[in-house]
């Protein structure tokens, strides 16, 4: 069984008004190579010292919450998901930890059980369900019960605009109001409802319109991401359907016609030459375990 590899896609959440509910898996990946058993957990990773390399690492701590009796191993982490940029890096780590426990502990978890555990650890299903299932997901958690629906959106292209600066999710949540008026909540939820219906019916122009009319979080978080209005304006000018914060930000998420994604990305690169612009795919595989690998390290 050893070694084996777990691959988990990145994700974007909200897609505008689908706050803490709508997520989409993206073609950036966290890979975890599980190596030999050792007396103590050890994580080889490419990040700075703020990311632990022992059992306090989020991947390992998640695995141990799922199965406390797991034997310790060396694991190597390879990732091109930027940290604290709104692209689901923590959700990917949580999903990897659950799959690590599932494989090493021979738990035979169902997909629904993985989603339930991941939502329990993350607090909301959007990112984690997307990383587990792939594709686009709409999820809800109510009194501990998690419901998720997966859809495919293969006509869509995705562009991510990734600023250099980090934005901690807790900081981004701090600017949100604790309550809304009834009238505000009705307006906000109606926009979210139309977004979801348009995603299901593949009404992409309506998706783009709704993702730019959010009332749940973007009006408050946009002050932390001053790049949003100008990127939104240019993306629309170049033919994109719509632009929104990716999760809590600071990255921006742009939906385009699939066949035009490269051209739109290239035009944005010319306008914003100092900012990373990534042409991505929607990932449709979700978490994948590969037992047929060799490790020469």
UniProtKB/Swiss-Prot annotation:
Q: GO MF annotations for this entry?
A: ATP binding; homoserine kinase activity
One Gene Ontology cellular component: cytoplasm
Pathway it belongs to?
Amino-acid biosynthesis; L-threonine biosynthesis; L-threonine from L-aspartate: step 4/5
Task: Give the family per the record.
Answer: Belongs to the GHMP kinase family. Homoserine kinase subfamily.
Q: Does the keyword Nucleotide-binding apply?
A: yes
Free-text function comment from the UniProt entry: Catalyzes the ATP-dependent phosphorylation of L-homoserine to L-homoserine phosphate.
Q: Does the UniProt entry include the keyword Signal?
A: no
Q: Which domain of life is it from?
A: Bacteria
Its localization reads: Cytoplasm
Sorted UniProt keywords: Amino-acid biosynthesis, ATP-binding, Cytoplasm, Kinase, Nucleotide-binding, Threonine biosynthesis, Transferase
Where does the chain cross the membrane?
A: none
Q: Which InterPro entries match?
A: GHMP_kinase_C_dom, GHMP_kinase_C_sf, GHMP_kinase_N_dom, GHMP_knse_ATP-bd_CS, Homoserine_kinase, Ribosomal_Su5_D2-typ_SF, Ribsml_uS5_D2-typ_fold_subgr
Enzyme Commission no = 2.7.1.39
Protein name from the UniProt record: Homoserine kinase
């Amino acid at each position: 069984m050893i070694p084996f590899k777990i691959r988990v896609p990145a994700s974007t959440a909200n897609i505008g008004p689908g706050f803490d509910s709508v997520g989409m898996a993206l073609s950036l990946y966290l890979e975890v190579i599980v190596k030999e058993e050792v007396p103590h957990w050890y994580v080889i990773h490419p990040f700075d010292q703020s990311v632990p390399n022992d059992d306090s690492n989020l991947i390992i701590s998640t695995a141990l919450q799922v199965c406390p009796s797991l034997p310790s191993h060396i694991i190597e982490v390879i990732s091109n998901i930027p940290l604290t940029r709104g692209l689901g890096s923590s959700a990917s780590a949580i999903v990897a930890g659950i799959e690590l426990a599932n494989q090493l502990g021979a738990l035979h978890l169902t997909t629904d059980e993985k989603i339930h555990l991941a939502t329990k650890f993350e607090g909301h299903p959007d990112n984690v369900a997307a990383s587990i299932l792939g594709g686009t997901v709409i999820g809800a958690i109510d009194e501990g019960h998690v419901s998720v629906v997966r859809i495919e959106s293969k006509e869509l292209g995705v562009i991510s605009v990734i600023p250099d600066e980090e934005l901690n999710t807790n900081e981004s949540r701090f600017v949100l109001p604790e309550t809304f008026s009834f009238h505000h909540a009705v307006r906000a939820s109606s926009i979210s409802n139309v977004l979801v219906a348009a995603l299901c019916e593949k009404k992409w122009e309506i998706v783009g319109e709704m993702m730019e009319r959010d009332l749940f979080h973007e009006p408050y978080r946009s002050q932390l991401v001053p790049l949003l209005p100008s990127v939104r304006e240019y993306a629309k000018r170049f033919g994109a359907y719509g632009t929104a914060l990716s999760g809590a930000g600071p990255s921006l998420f742009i939906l385009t016609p699939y066949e035009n994604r490269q051209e739109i990305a290239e035009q944005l690169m010319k306008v914003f030459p100092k900012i990373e612009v990534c042409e991505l795919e929607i990932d449709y595989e979700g978490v994948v375990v590969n037992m047929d690998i060799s490790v020469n390290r």
